[in-house]
């Protein structure tokens, strides 16, 4: 039933179907905090690290990511582990009657059924409430503004580096793509922003200002660090280590010296910086 639905890359510019199902379920997505992650590169790695940091702080966590590698259950994680087969079936059985109601209503009005990705998003949001989690880390499937996950009222948004991707659906320019991805920014939220090309940075800044959001931005290596406009997030140092790297991070809250990151690659250090800043924002 789930796999027979429209594939996740078929984006309909509407959140109405997902919102309608969640409303019938009693809005489970409002019972826990959320970190919403978009961008072009590094979303899943950043999501996983954010979840690990939040769990290390004593929080019960959920994570929704895509695509999956071996089993569809990987997309919905509870306390760092894929949801069990029993849990996955229970989540589907919980939402199925309401999905059917909204499908029928939508088709009667000439619209589509919920897509594969929309159903999985609803299942995840319901499963997180049922578990229950304290915080869920939610990765956007495609874009942001019209992504099924954008029904959440996240108080922390993370935007990883933006490049050209899914141009058929998001637009042919970096400005257009950034506009769609910045659509996850909510009123009064905190936005963690990776170093971006100028066109993307300008679009994100405009969205943040319009939503009165607090921006914690990764510093451009060419920026004057004494400038009040300079980003506050920075990878200060990296050293190779057995099984990974030692990284010194600077955030709005502190400098973390020689933190061991069990992953290789400079890009993973920058993903970890975003995750650290997101976890700080959740913990306040």
Language model features with spans:
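Charged, amphipathic alpha-helical linker segments immediately N-terminal to NTP-binding catalytic cores
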Residues: 1-9
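ATP-dependent carboxylate-amine ligase catalytic core
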Residues: 9-11, 15, 19-30, 56-152, ...
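A conserved segment at the C-terminal end of the G1
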Residues: 33, 37, 45-65
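Conserved beta-strand scaffold positions in the cores of enzyme catalytic domains, especially
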Residues: 34-36, 61-63, 151, 157, ...
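Aromatic/hydrophobic pocket-lining residues that form π-stacking "cages" and hydrophobic walls in ligand
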Residues: 50, 124, 204
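Short glycine/threonine-rich catalytic loop with a Thr-x-Gly-x-Asp
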Residues: 61, 149, 263-276
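Acidic, Mg2+-coordinating active-site environments of NTP-dependent enzymes
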Residues: 102-109, 132-139, 154-259, 269-284
């Amino acid at each position: 039933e789930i796999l027979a639905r429209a594939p996740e890359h078929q984006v309909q510019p509407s959140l109405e179907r997902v919102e309608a199902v969640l409303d019938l379920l009693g809005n489970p997505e409002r019972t826990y905090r959320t970190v919403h992650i978009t961008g072009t590169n590094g979303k899943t790695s950043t999501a996983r690290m954010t979840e690990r940091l939040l769990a290390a702080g004593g929080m019960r966590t959920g994570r929704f990511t895509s695509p999956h590698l071996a089993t569809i259950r990987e997309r919905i994680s509870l306390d760092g582990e894929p949801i069990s087969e029993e849990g996955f079936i229970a989540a589907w059985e919980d939402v199925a009657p309401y999905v059917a109601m909204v499908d029928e209503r939508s088709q009667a009005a000439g619209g589509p059924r919920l897509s594969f990705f929309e159903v999985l998003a609803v299942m995840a949001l319901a499963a997180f409430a049922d578990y229950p989690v304290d915080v869920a880390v939610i990765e956007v499937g495609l874009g942001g503004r019209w992504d099924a996950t954008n029904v959440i009222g996240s108080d922390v948004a993370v935007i990883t580096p933006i490049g050209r991707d899914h141009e058929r659906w998001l637009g042919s320019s970096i400005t257009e793509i950034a506009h769609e991805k910045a659509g996850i920014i909510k009123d009064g939220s905190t936005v963690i922003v990776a170093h971006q090309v100028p066109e993307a940075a300008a679009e994100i800044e405009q969205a943040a200002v319009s939503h009165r959001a607090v921006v914690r931005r990764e510093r451009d290596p060419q920026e004057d660090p004494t400038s009040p406009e300079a980003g506050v997030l920075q990878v200060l140092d990296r050293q190779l280590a057995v099984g990974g790297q030692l990284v010194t991070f600077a955030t709005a809250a502190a400098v973390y010296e020689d933190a061991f990151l069990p992953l290789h690659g400079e890009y993973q250090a920058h993903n970890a910086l975003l995750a650290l800043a997101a976890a700080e924002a959740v913990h306040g």
